[in-house]
Amino acid sequence: MSQPLILAIDQGTQSVRALLFDTTGTLVGRGYQPIEPYFSDRPGWAEQHPTYFWDNLGQACQALWENTGATPDQVVGVTVTTQRGTVVTLDNQGQPLRPAILWLDQRHADIQERLPGPWGWLFRGLRLDDTIDQFRRNAQANWLSQHEPDTWQRTRHYLLLSGYLNYRLTGQFRDSTASQVGYLPFDFRRHQWAGQRNFKWQLMPVRKDQLPELVRPGETLGQLTAEAATHLGLTSGLPVIAAASDKACEVLGSGGLTPDTACLSYGTTATINVSNPRYVEPVRLMPPYPSAIPGHYSTEVMIYRGYWMVSWFKREFGLREQRIAEHRGIEPEVLFDELVNSVPPGSMGLMLQPYWSPGVRHPGPDAKGAMVGFGDVHTRAHIYRAILEGLAYALREGKERIERRSGTEITTLRVAGGGSRSNAAM
């Protein structure tokens, strides 16, 4: 019998990857499809058509079969992980009503009045009403109901991107509990939709019947439909297994299984995560997200625009290195590492505050990025090193906060994400 394989699909912000693993976790095949992260019809908006994600998922699978010796009949199961917090609205026929609103989107609902009733009184008494109102402003459902009421009226299914792709794979509206990261009426302590009397239902107009059925990671979501099987180049009827969000899978894959082991993610969003069987909030009223390990929590500190800032620097200031790298047939990262190494630690007093986009609770919705300490000695190289150092210090601050909140010392660091390929960043 040929070796059984699992097809894992990673739908990220900038690419789709179709990955084949054997039963020991060894990668045996890879297909890669770059995508346009989003389009923006207005400043601060970030949208993409749901069908665009699905079409490119198929392209990634096609690239996989063209570049591996493995065959589709070896695949015994399929699983999907996606970017977090991207919202898809479908009508009663399962068709998208509008472009997906990505996690990068910066639009806000207009909140004029405080939350009424007993919950509102309680939050005002605890001085948490500003936090609650920020949640209401950020919830995409509130913006949709205010600015696109016809669309919201027709919304039968309110899904994250993971739920949409699992629907396209199985024909069922089911999703993993470990993928529910966003502005949703989700009980992060119990890993289920919030109870009927929970205050979260008052924060947004979402109904429970609009949400998918939830399944624990590792359990079966459904079977691959004939249409989806053709799209992926597989046999219909294969089990589709519940995975987790991309960050949660990254933590699991890097071996972050215990509270004393932290996973640093050098991705578009830079994070430090710790898996814990206990519910530990990194900041008060900021819940730990569901872990890929059933029944566990992922305590996370996030730098929203993390290693996106590295891409920003390369785009705005790194054209020379990119052209030289193309001419020499090497990766641009080699030259950028040389740029960093030409500058002493500390960037000769140039410091960066890495908040190109604000946080909800920390550092707060009004935070701004800044570079401080410029002098006549500073060059592009100093700016680049200051970016890396600013991110590193922000992640260190996150590590220390998690240690204080959990009462557990972090003794091991695991590093993942695109930025981990840079020796200078490491």
Regions found by a protein language model. Name each.
Residues 45, 103, 301-305:
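Short alpha-helix boundary/capping segments
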Residues 66-103, 129-135, 166-186, 213-218:
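Short beta-strand-loop/turn "lid" adjacent to the catalytic site in phosphate-handling enzymes
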Residues 16, 38, 87, 111, ...:
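Conserved protein kinase catalytic core
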Residues 36-39, 106-108, 307-308:
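A short local loop/turn or secondary-structure capping micro-motif enriched for an aromatic residue
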Residues 1-99, 114, 154, 229-230, ...:
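N-terminal glycine/serine-rich phosphate-binding loop of ATP-dependent small-molecule kinases
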Residues 101, 105-120:
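Short alpha-helix plus adjacent loop in nuclease-associated cores
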Residues 7-9, 23, 116-132, 136-174, ...:
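Active-site core segments that coordinate phosphate-bearing ligands/cofactors
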